[in-house]
C-alpha cells in the first residue's frame, strides 16, 4: 500500500525548480540579441526526468521564429547550466514549445465580448 503524499509531489518540486532556474538562465544567459523578451510560463517533466517541455511566450511576436531558433541552438548550453544549478541524477533533455494558451484565451475573450455586444438586452 502506498503512503499518502503530503504537500507537493517530488515531480512538482523538480518542475518548479527547473522552471525558476530556466527563467533565470534565459534572462541572463542568452546573449543573442535577435531573441525576443522570453518568459518561461510552464515546464512539464516526464516521470523519469528524462525530458522537460518548456512552454514560453515572447513579448515581440515578430521575433517568434528567430526566438525558436535561438532557443534550439542554446538548448545544450541551457541544459549544462541547469545541471550546475540543480542536483538531479538525470538532467532532462529540454524541448521548447511556444505557449499559445495566452493567444487562444485572448481570442476566446474577444469572441465572448463580440457575442455579448450582438445579443440584445432583455428586460
Curated annotation (Swiss-Prot):
<dbReference type="GO" id="GO:0030490">
    <property type="term" value="P:maturation of SSU-rRNA"/>
</dbReference>
<dbReference type="GO" id="GO:0005829">
    <property type="term" value="C:cytosol"/>
</dbReference>
<comment type="function">
    <text>One of several proteins that assist in the late maturation steps of the functional core of the 30S ribosomal subunit. Associates with free 30S ribosomal subunits (but not with 30S subunits that are part of 70S ribosomes or polysomes). Required for efficient processing of 16S rRNA. May interact with the 5'-terminal helix region of 16S rRNA.</text>
</comment>
<dbReference type="Pfam" id="PF02033">
    <property type="entry name" value="RBFA"/>
</dbReference>
<dbReference type="InterPro" id="IPR000238">
    <property type="entry name" value="RbfA"/>
</dbReference>
<keyword id="KW-0963">Cytoplasm</keyword>
<comment type="subunit">
    <text>Monomer. Binds 30S ribosomal subunits, but not 50S ribosomal subunits or 70S ribosomes.</text>
</comment>
<dbReference type="GO" id="GO:0043024">
    <property type="term" value="F:ribosomal small subunit binding"/>
</dbReference>
<protein>
    <recommendedName>
        <fullName>Ribosome-binding factor A</fullName>
    </recommendedName>
</protein>
<comment type="similarity">
    <text>Belongs to the RbfA family.</text>
</comment>
<keyword id="KW-0690">Ribosome biogenesis</keyword>
<dbReference type="InterPro" id="IPR015946">
    <property type="entry name" value="KH_dom-like_a/b"/>
</dbReference>
<dbReference type="InterPro" id="IPR023799">
    <property type="entry name" value="RbfA_dom_sf"/>
</dbReference>
<dbReference type="InterPro" id="IPR020053">
    <property type="entry name" value="Ribosome-bd_factorA_CS"/>
</dbReference>
Amino acid at each position: 500500500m502506498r503512503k499518502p503524499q503530503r504537500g507537493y509531489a517530488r515531480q512538482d518540486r523538480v518542475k518548479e525548480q527547473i522552471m525558476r532556474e530556466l527563467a533565470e538562465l534565459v534572462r541572463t544567459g542568452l546573449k543573442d540579441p535577435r531573441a525576443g523578451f522570453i518568459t518561461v510560463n510552464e515546464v512539464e517533466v516526464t516521470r523519469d526526468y528524462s525530458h522537460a517541455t518548456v512552454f514560453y511566450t515572447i513579448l515581440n511576436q515578430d521575433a517568434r521564429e528567430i526566438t525558436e531558433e535561438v532557443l534550439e541552438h542554446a538548448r545544450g548550453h541551457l541544459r549544462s547550466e541547469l545541471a550546475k544549478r540543480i542536483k538531479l541524477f538525470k538532467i532532462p533533455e529540454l524541448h521548447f514549445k511556444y505557449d499559445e494558451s495566452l493567444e487562444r484565451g485572448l481570442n476566446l475573450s474577444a469572441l465572448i465580448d463580440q457575442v455579448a455586444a450582438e445579443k440584445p438586452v432583455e428586460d
